[in-house]
């Protein structure tokens, strides 16, 4: 038994499922999860000392690579001054100014400690600002584990929310309406049936929680138009896409100005940080300037702010955005070429520093229904073959993968070599 397997067995005695976030348990791919001991650059090292080229990147934050010396030094320096004050600091101001400069739609912003806090707070703010209770999200899009966002209503239940998790009251869930991603007609139908009742649309500009699905042409423009017509707010959940798709986030990449934006992951440089912000007139509704209450003991934590500030300053250095996108495109194209070589149907998507691949013969994958038609069993086999070859992909067919600026040609070549071998095995097994 490996040390990872031993640790997993031990963890299950005191931690539900042995993990502190479900996807880490490898339920989506089978087998026992690897337990990580340390990480450096593009690599993670498990408890048995084996190295893996990492394309999970702590689920997105490690855009500069693991254990970056500048971020590490910033954290150490901040920690030496104190771990938490529960009072404002100058670093919070500098951080807010930097984010607002990089993402101009965020005229004002509030720091929180996670992406879930960011989306939860933005939803409350949208409801308070508009005086409306209902919200609209998209099937297959994930916005954190707040009750109002843990709703997945599809097919015949587009206008009546239903809990996708026990513990979400059915009556409460009815306030969350669910449309089909990349389908403006479904959005218009919901607004028509709920005239003057919808506070906001919340959307992942690139859907990264059903693998990686970019918007079809005109989708975000249509959402912006509908919100303007209906008096609803448009919220971009950029927890995953923020600073990864482009320096100015996905909203800059697609040239769309949302009313509110939610950030997480990259903004903390590996530390627990989230933020939400947007139009000044909307943000003024947040306490203490307005009636919508939001607070947090660790919001604006000085150590986390130091990490995030260092990360964003490094990230915005000239050429980094193009370098990251180029690396990711090379990898995504390589996967597709190798799949074609071995006669395995595969569809690959890539936007900036995130990518995803689907084992499918569909010509397009644009929504959750399309994703469910993909070959999950083949993905599981590919995942474990790649893991055996020292490549760590997202352990779920429904999650995006990420590159970092630390991934060099050596790692990319080794990854594609592993993919070539893995796909060859799958092709042979399919005969």
UniProtKB/Swiss-Prot annotation:
What's the top EC group for this one? isomerase
What InterPro entries does the annotation carry? 4pyrrol_synth_GluAld_NH2Trfase, Aminotrans_3, Aminotrans_3_PPA_site, PyrdxlP-dep_Trfase, PyrdxlP-dep_Trfase_major, PyrdxlP-dep_Trfase_small
List residues, modification N6-(pyridoxal phosphate)lysine.
265
- A GO MF label: transaminase activity
Q: Which residues form the signal peptide?
A: none
Assembly, in brief, is: Homodimer.
Q: Which family does it belong to?
A: Belongs to the class-III pyridoxal-phosphate-dependent aminotransferase family. HemL subfamily.
This protein is called Glutamate-1-semialdehyde 2,1-aminomutase
Species of provenance: Vibrio atlanticus (strain LGP32)
